[in-house]
Amino acid sequence: MAPRTQKSTSGTPGGSGTPGPDEGPQISPGGTYGLEDVVVGCKAFVQKPDVVTGEMEERKAEILSIREKPKPRLTKKQQAELADKPAPTLEETLEYYVHYCEFNKRLDEWVSGTRLITSRELEWPKKEVTSDKTKRKVIRAGSGATTPSTPLTPTGKGYRGAGASNLLKKAAAQAAKNVQGESGLETPQKRKADSGDTSTAQSIRADSIDADADGEDDENGAVVAMEMLGGNDQQEKDDVATESNGGLTASLNANQGQETFSKKQEIEKLRTSGSMTQSVSEVARVKNLNKIQMGKSEVETWYFSPYPLEYAHIDTLYICEMCLSYFPSPFTLKRHRSKCTLLHPPGNEIYRHEDISFFEIDGRLQRTWCRNLCLLSKCFLDHKTLYYDVDPFLYYCMVKRDDLGCHLLGYFSKEKDSAENYNVACILTLPQHQRAGYGKLLIEFSYELTKIEGKLGSPEKPLSDLGLLSYRAYWAEIIVELLLKTEDEISIEEIAQKTAFTHADILHTCMALNMLKQYQGKHMIVLSDLIISKYTAKRPRKRINPQKLHWTAKNWHRSQLNFGW
């Protein structure tokens, strides 16, 4: 049903204030509003250039954040020339972070005000209603430091610069901590409990980076973002403009059935998983980098990554291909490269075949390099979280060798001691090397390690959409290959022992490919002509040679598994 248009009244261009919770979205006709009226949460039409033809298309997009365009450093002469020019208009000074409706989140981008089409209709955000239970819980929590969120408008009082908003959030966090400290209560760090709803799309849980949950800078200067506490979606939208410094810190829970833990209790209670968070607001951050330059490749980033704040508005971040250090300009990178002596990842080379090598890196021994790797991978993994240290993880980096050194293609990480026998915590092929078969090579290598351990392994669940497609394609390829080579009867257990796949993954793959058939009261695995033809039509890819792998499973001491202290 098409959304209905509300009658116009005073207060909001083209309509009355904000619609009630039971009403449809309020829509203002084109030409009845200006850029100064657009707030976070509105849905407007935006010009988007077509990748192939370059022509401008009109796409409906939701406004997630508003900011002033970053001002470049100017010489005195340039400042004098700029002073003689007329003042820039609102369209030229503001940028809008938009999410294109019905498109993937990785297409979100900053657009200038000139690309917003005010001649088309504008859909206003719905009003969020706070229940009586939530209000009473806020009062009991004594969190007087938190204030109702104010719509983020370019000209209104609710619009603040990034620096001012960050300071206010830090002050609010400190005030909340002081209030609870005076009342003799320990300030809890919120951890959303598992709700059992596995339908929420989440990526492969990622390995972690050193971070206290207080939003302070770590020793490398990387700002660690805090979880946004509270269940108000409007607050999440309003605060998204300054998400590079984390969400609003509070010590209350908006949902009754969720527990809260202090950091110490959290570390004791939770297993050392890669993600360590189930917060929905974790994926609501605004992308802070546009592009990264790594070696010969210039890559557009997909998601937010908590690099230092001073790098948030630069056009391109330059990354050393060997040590993964980051720099704001090509000059500083060139100066670093003249001193950087690293030619390969700082670990043990456990595999070498042709021009491909794998290095094993202990997060406890190479913290700086692993943290830089986590920051880089966060640019391309939506649900990857950087909360705890890298100590409990091993990193297996795939590189391509040439005369200049070893160039990173991708990596996967795994816990040193996984309670659920996960053999992968986070896996990534760098975008500039995707669609070349390296993803399956990483997956195959992880299962070769699992075979040496004598276990059945599986990636950490739930998988992302792309991760599920990659793993399902690999599982199908290996299972079909094994069945075609086997002439005798074979069971699910025998397939698991030969491939190191878990029984659940084998059954999932067989059901997805419609390979399970019932015959005379028994389930049979049947390969259809379509499945066989697809398998034979695939082009050959690089494979792992087990004879070139020199690695033994390790038994970790408890002191080597401690982290977060």
From Swiss-Prot:
Entry comment on modification after translation: Autoacetylation at Lys-384 is required for proper function.
Residues of the active site: 460 (proton donor/acceptor)
Binding annotation for acetyl-CoA: 425-429, 434-440, 464
Modified residues (N6-acetyllysine): 384
Pfam families hit by this protein: MOZ_SAS, Tudor-knot, zf-MYST
GO biological process, one term: positive regulation of transcription elongation by RNA polymerase II
Record keywords, A-Z: Acetylation, Activator, Chromatin regulator, Chromosome, DNA damage, DNA repair, Metal-binding, Nucleus, Transcription, Transcription regulation, Transferase, Zinc, Zinc-finger
Region annotation Disordered: where it falls in the sequence: 1-33, 173-217
Family: Belongs to the MYST (SAS/MOZ) family.
Stated role: Catalytic component of the NuA4 histone acetyltransferase (HAT) complex which is involved in epigenetic transcriptional activation of selected genes principally by acetylation of nucleosomal histones H4, H3, H2B, H2A and H2A variant H2A.Z. Acetylates histone H4 to form H4K5ac, H4K8ac, H4K12ac and H4K16ac, histone H3 to form H3K14ac, and histone H2A to form H2AK4ac and H2AK7ac. The NuA4 complex is involved in the DNA damage response and is required for chromosome segregation. The NuA4 complex plays a direct role in repair of DNA double-strand breaks (DSBs) through homologous recombination.
Subunit record text: Component of the NuA4 histone acetyltransferase complex.
Protein name (database record): Histone acetyltransferase ESA1
